[in-house]
């Protein structure tokens, strides 16, 4: 039976803004308070989806969340009508209103961790929504994320969904941004690679000193247990704390893997040789041939990697066995990175082509091509069980562009977040979107009695 990797990209929400909410994310911090263009952001994301679909890759779409999150503000003590809640929050606690308006759910690499059926004990595709406990504005996402994923992957014979891990720092879980999978073919058993920043309960593990380590070893282990993964198909690795302190807040900012290939920076991990040895041995036991592509710090510094998002790229397998690397425009604008990429594609390795996309609206908030997509490896029968409304087609692309142009503003600043009309616009747009994508009532405003 055929098998595929399907990339489900996050659709940028109507409240996309530069709130500077993500401490440890250099781009998010440095672009704080700039004016944003939600319409352009959504169009840039859709253009990438369309281009990859037209190149023959399986492509889906993941809906954004309801923002501002009025229920979250009510939990923090703001009362009155929805409009009054917004106005009171704007007057008394603007940072809380900004957080409740964040469109950060567009970075669906953080939506969940996904294990394909070939790896799991019960032979189903498993999803665990990420609690994103490290940042308040993201910690409020997982209930809606779970409902949206449940509406997309609803057949319980094929798909299994788990609640987010306990919402405490010891089980901080950032989803697929700290997880990748190696395999000979997508439908065959593989090796799942979990990368963590610290241990919650074992002080012998080093930890970063400046920025928080968002993923714990204990969270990664819990997800592996929930998904029914066997020890011979799992490798845990600690990310280098020094690079976290340089702005590498998720592992997908310093490495990316696909198939039998790991593309990584020399400074990405602690005990790199041991990690690579485990990956090689465990993948070999599954019939695979692991290949590591190390980018030396002499060619590309960690600072270059963070500025360009070289590793926050998509590594995609072509029909002929070669690979395509999808990178943001910022890579072309960095001389050292662009020189390295030219060498990479000409040296006879698996990466044969680099494709550049303009994702500036997302990049200025610290999210590149890899942040915008959730990978789901599916066999042919499993793909047939996915809600067809979320699979990208030329027709769906056209419909979504028209939907964006109809509902999204082309300018959004902090003061605009206090406008109750923005909430009305967002709810109107999302109500229409659930009909376009055939999701049913997944948003809180649709579920109120």
Swiss-Prot record:
Binding-site list for substrate: 19-28, 110, 137-138, 214, 252, 365
User: Could you tell me the superkingdom of the organism this chain comes from?
Assistant: Bacteria
Q: In which pathway does it act?
A: Amino-acid degradation; L-arginine degradation via AST pathway; L-glutamate and succinate from L-arginine: step 2/5
Q: Where is the composition biased (Polar residues)?
A: 25-37
Decide whether keyword Chloroplast is in the record: no
Residues annotated as transmembrane: none
- Which UniProt keywords are given for this protein, alphabetically ordered? Arginine metabolism, Hydrolase
Question: What top-level class of enzyme does the UniProt entry assign?
Answer: hydrolase
What Enzyme Commission number(s) does the record list for this chain? 3.5.3.23
User: Which biological process terms from the Gene Ontology are attached to this UniProt entry?
Assistant: arginine catabolic process to glutamate; arginine catabolic process to succinate
What reaction does this enzyme carry out catalytically? Answer: N(2)-succinyl-L-arginine + 2 H2O + 2 H(+) = N(2)-succinyl-L-ornithine + 2 NH4(+) + CO2
Q: Name one GO molecular function term.
A: N-succinylarginine dihydrolase activity
* Assigned protein family: Belongs to the succinylarginine dihydrolase family.
Q: What does this protein do?
A: Catalyzes the hydrolysis of N(2)-succinylarginine into N(2)-succinylornithine, ammonia and CO(2).
Q: Which HAMAP family match?
A: AstB
Q: How does it assemble?
A: Homodimer.
What is this protein's record name? N-succinylarginine dihydrolase
Q: Which organism is it from?
A: Pseudomonas entomophila (strain L48)
